[in-house]
C-alpha cells in the first residue's frame, strides 16, 4: 500500500484550534477580485472519523465505492483503510495507489469484455454477475476466475435512487444461475445486493438479508460453499437526513445475527460511498452575474415582489450534476451571518452555462447579494466531482484538502502499524474509541485489520 503523502496532494495540516471552515474563509479572503473561481475544501479527517464511526456501529467490512468520489487524495486516504470499484479506470486508480488485487471487488454486474480481461490480467478475481449471459461472458473472458458473487434484486422502492430496476437476479432465477455456474465449474463464493442509494427505510435491509440467506441455502443445495455476503450501500453521509446511520445499523445488526450469525463463517462486506464522503466536502461558489426581476416584469408574475436571479461559477454541468442525477436538494449558506434586521428576498440561483436547464436553486430567501460575493454549499462530497464535466468550457473547481493534526497522526499510525486496538478519545472527538470492543459486538469487522476496494 502506498502511503498518503500530504505534500503530493497539497493537504494542509490544521493546527490546534483551526477547522476546515477557517481554511475556507482564508481561501475566500486570499483570492483577488479578478480570480474568484469556485473551489472545494475537503476535510479528510472527517472521512477518517466516518470510518471510526462505522467500525463502532456495524460489524461489516466497508469497501468504499470509488464511483461516488474518485478524487485521488480522497481515494488514497481510504485506500489506507478500505475501498470498492466498477470499471477498468477505477481499478487502475486504486491499484496505482498500491491496493492489491485480492482486496478489489469488481462490483458491476454488466461488464465490457475488454474490461473483464483487464481485470483478469491484473489479478482481480472477485466480481459480480446477475444473468446467464454475464456468467458465460466472464467464463470466456476470465477463464481463471474463481470468485463470482451473485447479485440479487431487492425491494428498493423506498430508495432515492433505485438500482434493482437495472441490476439483480430474482430468487427463482438465482437457483438457475447457481446450477449453470456449477455446470461450468465456476465457483460462486457469495451473494450481493443493494437496497438503493439514499435508502429511507432500514427494514428493506431485513428482507434483503432474508432473501440472501435463501440464496445461500440454494448454493449449499447445488454444491457451493459460499462465504461472502455483500450488503451494498444506501447509507446516509450527512446529518441533514431523516434517517440516521445508527438507525439503519440498529436494524441491520439483529438481522445479520439472525440470518448470518458470527459463527456462520460468512464474511460480510458493504459498499458505502456517500456515507464516507458527503459531509467532508464544502463548495464555495462566486456570484458572477445578477439580475433584478421587478414586480410586473415579463420574467415574473405580476403579484410577486422584487426578486433576484444570481448566476454563480459552478452549475449542474459541474458539481451540481447531483441535482439531476442524484436527486440532491442543495441549500446556499453565506460566509458571514446577515444582520438581524436585514431584509430577505425571493431568489433563484443559476449556473454559468448557456443552458436554461442550468438552475441550482429554484427559489430561496436571501438578503440582497452582489457580484463578487460568495455562497457556500455543504455536504457536497457525494456524486459531485466524479461526474462533473467541462461543458461550455467551464473548468471543474479546485480541491483544497485539510486534516487536523491528531487525525493526521492517526492516519500515519494506521498506515505504518495497522489499525490500533484503541484510539484515544482526544484523537477523534466524540467518535468511537475502538473497532468493536466499545460497541459490545461479538462480530469484529475485518476492516480493523485490512483495507479493501469495491470496483
From Swiss-Prot:
The keyword Lyase applies. The modification N6-(pyridoxal phosphate)lysine is found at residue 67. InterPro entries: Ala_racemase/Decarboxylase_C (IPR009006), De-COase2_C (IPR022643), De-COase2_N (IPR022644), De-COase2_pyr-phos_BS (IPR022653), Orn/DAP/Arg_de-COase (IPR000183), Orn_de-COase (IPR002433), PLP-binding_barrel (IPR029066). Its cofactor is pyridoxal 5'-phosphate. GO terms for biological process: putrescine biosynthetic process from arginine, via ornithine; regulation of protein catabolic process. Belongs to the Orn/Lys/Arg decarboxylase class-II family. Pathway: Amine and polyamine biosynthesis; putrescine biosynthesis via L-ornithine pathway; putrescine from L-ornithine: step 1/1. It comes from the Eukaryota. Homodimer. Only the dimer is catalytically active, as the active sites are constructed of residues from both monomers. The active site is at residue 354. Its EC number is 4.1.1.17. This is Ornithine decarboxylase. The modification S-nitrosocysteine is found at residue 354. Catalyzes the first and rate-limiting step of polyamine biosynthesis that converts ornithine into putrescine, which is the precursor for the polyamines, spermidine and spermine. Polyamines are essential for cell proliferation and are implicated in cellular processes, ranging from DNA replication to apoptosis. It is an enzyme of class 4 (lyase). Coiled coil: none annotated. PANTHER family: ARGININE/DIAMINOPIMELATE/ORNITHINE DECARBOXYLASE, ORNITHINE DECARBOXYLASE.
